Amino acid sequence: MMNVMDTLAANAAQTEQRGRVVETSLKAAKAAGAFALRTPVAHGGSWATATVAVELIAAMARGCPSTAWIASTSLVSKNMISFGDYPAHTLDEVFADPDAVAGGVGIPRGHGESGPNGVRLSGRWASVSGCEDAVWASLGAMVDGAFAIVLIPMADLTIDRTWDVAGMSGTGSHSLVADDVLVPFDRVATGERLHYPPDGRTVQTWGVAVLATAVGATLGALDVVDTMFASNRKPFATSYTRMSESPGARHWLAEATTLVRRAERTMLALASRIDAEPGITDLEHAGMQRDRADAAKDCLAAIERMLDLHGASGFAKSNALQRFWRDVSVVSRHPALNPYLAVEGFGRALTESSPLPRPRA
């Protein structure tokens, strides 16, 4: 994992500036199996456990959070395909390259109607990470009034470059547009051919994959601070000759390290539970969501302490610390890590109230 982390770290600044993962990083990620984590074994993938997936994603995020994020969203997109009873020849086509990047959005932002030769689909799906490097997209849509997951080659879609965000810039999470695209029936799963919504283990796997990027990015920030402590850098306007001479600096470093290591332990514990438990109850689901959100808060708190230690120079655009800070700030606001909804959902589960309202199409 160190090899892929080092390669991604060397290209992280360029990936951010480009708004797209550089080719060298993409090749390294593919070689590490990052985009085959949820490719079926029958098609050359690993269909990895949650533990294996988060360990790899976190290691990648330690070098480049944007590249790691695309690995996590590709996992989700390929996992979505398993919800449909697609013909064998369709799956052979979609998974022809087990290491190909996949993009997708489960929210039904498209509408289609059946015709004699297939479904005519139009729609717009925002925030499709890695779409410029993806080969296939798995997209939620309303087809003939019913929810469906539709598989479409990226070549049949238009990319609207809408992603312009303070952090996670290298993910290239632009919008996909379909304008009266003809989709063969064997690439549309709906009704009895669609097994949806996903089970608790699948939802939790997706959530912990999101957390893995936040944890890995915070560990990457800690690497920057550890390097600073090992250097001749000293606290400004003091008589100390090194950072490590300051009891306050040592205390702040200890707190930052404790926070991120606690988040890492939470991530691994959640992944282990997902792999071990055949089913997840509503109360367990809510508790795991709360734990994810708490771990994300630990990441945010840790990186703030690191910035305190580094001072204003940590915000220099040439300093990797500020990039990790921005990336962690953005990814920790993902719905899977939302703290107030996690608390609300846990409270509902504890009192056996109705679950959180589902989003409307």
Regions found by a protein language model. Name each.
Residues A9, A13-Q17, R261-D294, E304-F315:
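C-terminal helix-coil-helix/basic helical segment that borders enzyme active sites and/or dimer interfaces
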Residues V21-A31, F35-A134:
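Glycine-rich flavin
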Residues G103-G106, A141, M154-V165, G170:
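Active-site glycine-rich loop that binds ribose-phosphate moieties when present
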Residues A126-C131, W206, V331-H334:
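Glycine-rich phosphate/pyrophosphate-binding beta-alpha loops
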Residues S127-D160:
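A short core secondary-structure module
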Residues A166-V260:
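Glycine-rich beta->alpha junctions and the first turn(s) of the following alpha-helix
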Residues A312-A361:
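Glycine-rich phosphate/cofactor-binding loops in nucleotide/flavin-utilizing enzymes
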